[in-house]
Amino acid sequence: MLKDILESLFCLFPIFYCGVRNLCRSHDWEKQAFLRTIKPGWSIIDVGANQGYYTNFFLKLIGQKGVVHAFEPIPSAFQILKNKVKYKENCFIHNVGVSSKNEVAQFFSPIEDSGKTSMKAHSCKLWNSLQKQIINSKVIRIDDFYPLQKLTKIDLIKIDTEGAELLVLKGAMETIKKNKPTIIFEACKECMKSFDYSVNDLDNFFSDLDYTNFRIVNKNLNSI
């Protein structure tokens, strides 16, 4: 509780908070990137919210005038997410996945680590060593999801879908064209292979939309 209160205070001064985390030699570079990027009042889409770690962090950065829409398809993770943000009036949570089609999809969810849930069974040894359950869940396209169409502006899309990132992006193409949001996501080559695409396909997607691509290296954003 105390840690959460202190972080809420630090988030009022994000650049100062970055400095503190650097002094503490924090290696959570994604968090550093969010601190340097997100502004009060922003509207954020959190795809693959899991148990709400970043959802809750975003709420601290955007303040009361911002809004977060968080998507999590796995019921057990969604329940934890729901409890974590239940008193946040500017946070809307959706128990669905996000993809390039509106349909029911199969998810492979490690029982001990729902954060590694994926719509494909990966071939890497670490992932294969985990005990998994298969869960069927509705998935939606961001472009077709009515609650998002009511937003006047979308400032940031965060994606963590263990390889399905390009599918999410393809289902959000019109939203991206209209809003030109900042997009931050993890890109794992092994996970991409399971979905039959590569880093080059991601680069081509963003080039077609006139985006500048960056890679987080340590605590810096490097143009690529």
Question: What does each model-found stretch correspond to?
Answer:
Residues M1-I224:
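Phosphate/nucleotide-binding beta-alpha loop and adjacent structural elements of enzyme active sites
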